[in-house]
Amino acid sequence: CSKRNLERAAQIAASTSVRLQTVTRFDLNITSGILHTAKEYEATSIVIGLHYKTNIVDSFFGSLTENLLKTTHLEVMVARFVMPVNVLRRIIVAVPPKSEFEHGFTKWITHLCRLSGQLGCRVHFYAHPQTLGYIRGFIEKRFKDTRTAYSELEDWDDLLILTGQVNYDHLFVIVSSRRGSISYDSSFEKLPMQISKYFNNNSVMLIYPGQKDDPNENLSFADPRGWAESQYYDKAGNWIYKWFKKNS
């Protein structure tokens, strides 16, 4: 199945004259396979599809996305397209306050400006006035030919106001951030519910900007997901052990 998907991706890329290098890898799990491959090929970004929730206890993002965000400093883009990319008419971007202080701030702007140029569509940014100033300044300096629009989004809690701005043929991009980063806000925890309820029929992309320091610089095959996550397994194991001991 994975081989067929790679072949299909190569065919699609070839039809658009895009160079695509396919890689088949055997590893302990999907997360460690992606991380080791990214390190070997010196990747700067990771793009994955949005997880398809299979049951009621399954999380919105799935374990793959969650593990990647915990164990790599690279930019991670999570996408779900409900129609071919080449028919998208506009890119709507919601940006949280203080995003301009993130290490990967200019990288995701660069990605969106280039995508806008390839699709021939406008990029409309919604952000705090101060953040909008940094976005506008960078684009005017580096991508002045990009068709853009800017609107103020004073409070990130007003994100749902954009439901009336995102149409079926738009790509809705939400710039988020990892827990503990400069622009992180507790309201990000509501994103899965908001996307599922209000943007379920839209093409959506979540961007997690790259971080300066790698949380798992010493990644190894012996500990592919990092020390931080293993702590949670240890705590869970100790709790189960104590519970059984108490009730035995």
Language-model segments: which ranges?
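Short amphipathic alpha-helix with an adjacent loop that forms part of the alpha/beta core around
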Residues: 35-38, 159-167
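Catalytic cores of nucleotide-enabled group-transfer and carboxylate-activating enzymes in metabolic
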Residues: 7, 11-13, 40-45
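Charged docking surfaces used in two-component/phosphorelay signaling
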Residues: 25-32
